[in-house]
Amino acid sequence: MALEPSRYLDKKTWKMTPAMIRARQPYFKKNMIALGLLLGITTGVYVYTFNLSHKDNDFIDVPIPPIDEKELAVLQKEFNDKKN
């Protein structure tokens, strides 16, 4: 059978036996430190990349052309028609 429990799992509840918990205990602290380090590095790279890519607004010096009232009314009508 593919899902037969090992001798370190309770056959009824599939929970770890006390022997398995004792066997894993020396590695728990190191694994949590490694997990924290891995998550910290990943988060740091993500935040650094996000801040680097959103630092400059490339279009800040591009002037926005003025729009007259007729064009604005046409655009608003088109928007409202698409919305409904």
From Swiss-Prot:
Pfam families: Coa3_cc (PF09813). It is a single-pass membrane protein. The chain crosses the membrane at residues 31-50. InterPro entries: Coa3, Coa3_cc. It is found in: Mitochondrion inner membrane. Its main location: mitochondrion. Residues 51-84 are mitochondrial intermembrane. One of its GO terms (biological process) is negative regulation of mitochondrial translation. Belongs to the COA3 family. PANTHER family: CYTOCHROME C OXIDASE ASSEMBLY FACTOR 3 HOMOLOG, MITOCHONDRIAL, CYTOCHROME C OXIDASE ASSEMBLY FACTOR 3, MITOCHONDRIAL. Component of 250-400 kDa complexes called cytochrome oxidase assembly intermediates or COA complexes. This is Cytochrome c oxidase assembly factor 3, mitochondrial. It comes from Vanderwaltozyma polyspora (strain ATCC 22028 / DSM 70294 / BCRC 21397 / CBS 2163 / NBRC 10782 / NRRL Y-8283 / UCD 57-17).
